[in-house]
């Protein structure tokens, strides 16, 4: 995905104005109700919609997460993001977060440990996640324009091996 194309449809994602490009080592593709569904990495930036002045954004109820498409639990699967403007940190909403179908969080696998590589500054971080729905924030020690996320460990899903991440929200202010 590059910001000049919107291959997954559905209009402009709320947070993607700063995304120059995004890619993943794999993405799950499946058929639902006769339609092909791709759980692409750009979905990380589609969790919220633009709102009004009093409520600047709200949850996008038609949002689907990024889901790795490798065999097994997705260990060592990656997401790479290049930003137009530097970021100072970011938040991740782990797992399959769906307000209308909350059982999907436990049914699918979730990240337990994530390696974060700051490709701009050649720095490395580790993010550890609790097994619950929340935003986990990582503050970068230096501003960056390029990051790579690698799944190191997962919480296994009760029904599916597929590992999911629902959202990534970058912090563009120091």
What is each model feature region?
Residues 1-78, 82, 174:
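Disordered, acidic Ser/Thr/Pro-rich linker "stalks" and the adjacent N-terminal cap
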Residues 14, 45-48, 83, 90, ...:
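Phenylalanine-focused residue identity feature
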Residues 20, 88-89, 112, 166:
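A short, local hydrophobic-aromatic micro-motif
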Residues 25-28, 73-76, 96-174:
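Trp- and acidic/polar-enriched beta-sheet ligand-binding modules for extracellular glycan
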Residues 32-35, 86, 100, 161:
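Residue-identity detector for glutamine
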Residues 80-81, 89-90, 149:
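Hydrophobic beta-strand segments within beta-rich accessory/binding domains
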Residues 83-86, 156:
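Generic detector of short alpha-helix boundary/capping microenvironments
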Residues 87-95, 99:
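Mid-length scaffold segments of soluble, non-membrane domains
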């Amino acid at each position: 995905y590059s910001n000049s194309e919107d291959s997954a449809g559905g209009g402009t994602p709320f947070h993607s104005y700063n995304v120059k490009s995004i890619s993943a080592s794999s993405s799950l593709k499946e058929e639902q109700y006769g339609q092909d569904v791709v759980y692409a990495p750009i979905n990380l930036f589609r969790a919220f919609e633009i709102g009004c002045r009093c409520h600047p954004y709200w949850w996008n109820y038609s949002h689907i997460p990024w889901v790795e498409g490798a065999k097994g639990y997705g260990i060592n699967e990656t997401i790479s993001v290049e930003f137009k403007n530097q970021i100072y940190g970011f938040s991740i909403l782990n797992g399959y977060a769906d307000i209308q179908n909350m059982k999907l969080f436990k049914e699918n696998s979730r990240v337990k440990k994530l390696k974060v590589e700051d490709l701009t500054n050649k720095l490395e971080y580790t993010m550890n996640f609790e097994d619950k729905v929340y935003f986990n924030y990582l503050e970068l020690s230096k501003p960056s324009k390029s990051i790579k996320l690698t799944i190191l460990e997962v919480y296994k899903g009760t029904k599916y091996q597929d590992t999911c991440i629902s959202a990534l929200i970058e912090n563009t202010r120091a």
